[in-house]
């Protein structure tokens, strides 16, 4: 599904833009988009960017960090997991710059209004660099709960994601993530 959503759809939209009277196409991608990534997600994002840029010269790419807001999957996942006394986290010390969805929207508006930015790639993040573990602790604290946030070893996470992928419901995290 990554390839269809991240690569094929941006390509199709860019082709439609090229055939129409569209002035600019803003493609929202993701920080870390890279053609050589081990992650299918990151490779598919990069390929979508490349195809959009190839098929419509007036494309602008925006690569946000993890996007947070009232209905986002990220914070809501850990809100749901806060029913557990212990919250396992893969990559507990991984640092990132979460960004509010409203700030992403502002960046999109600025990209639309900007002159001479065709073909540009903008990487955007929030003002704070935070570890994944500290972010989860912050979410739990906001909910006025006390939970233990612990590191889940990668081998266990891979086994868990493989098992969850067999269920008829979408997994919380894919093996690629």
Language model regions located:
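Conserved cofactor-binding/catalytic machinery of classical short-chain dehydrogenase/reductase
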Residues: 9, 24, 47-48, 100-103
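Short alpha-helix in the Rossmann-fold core of NAD(P)-dependent oxidoreductases
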Residues: 2-7, 26, 45, 97
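Conserved beta-loop-beta element that borders a ligand/cofactor-binding pocket
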Residues: 29, 49-73, 80
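NAD(P)H-binding glycine-rich loop region in Rossmannoid oxidoreductase-like domains
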Residues: 1-12, 16-19, 31-35
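Substrate-positioning beta->alpha
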Residues: 73-74, 91-113, 120-123
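Conserved catalytic Lys-bearing alpha helix of Rossmann-like short-chain dehydrogenase/reductases
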Residues: 7-13, 44-52
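Mid/C-terminal beta-alpha module of Rossmann-like enzyme folds, strongest
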Residues: 111-176
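A short C-terminal helix-loop "cap" of Rossmann-like NAD(P)-dependent dehydrogenase/epimerase domains
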Residues: 78-90
């Amino acid at each position: 599904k990554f390839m269809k959503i991240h690569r094929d759809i941006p390509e199709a939209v860019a082709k439609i833009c090229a055939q129409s009277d569209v002035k600019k196409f803003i493609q929202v991608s993701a920080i870390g988009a890279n053609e050589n990534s081990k992650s299918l997600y990151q490779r598919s994002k990069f390929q979508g960017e490349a195809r959009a840029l190839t098929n419509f010269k007036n494309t602008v790419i925006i690569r946000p960090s993890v996007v947070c807001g009232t209905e986002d999957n990220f914070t809501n996942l850990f809100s749901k997991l806060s029913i557990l006394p212990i919250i396992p986290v893969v990559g507990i010390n991984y640092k990132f710059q979460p960004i509010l969805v409203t700030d992403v929207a502002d960046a999109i508006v600025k990209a639309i209004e900007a002159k001479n930015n065709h073909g540009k790639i903008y990487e955007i993040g929030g003002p704070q660099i935070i570890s994944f573990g500290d972010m989860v602790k912050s979410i739990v604290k906001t909910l006025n709960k006390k939970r233990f946030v612990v590191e889940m070893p990668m081998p266990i996470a891979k086994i868990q994601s493989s098992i969850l992928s067999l269920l008829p419901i979408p997994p919380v995290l894919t093996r690629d993530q």
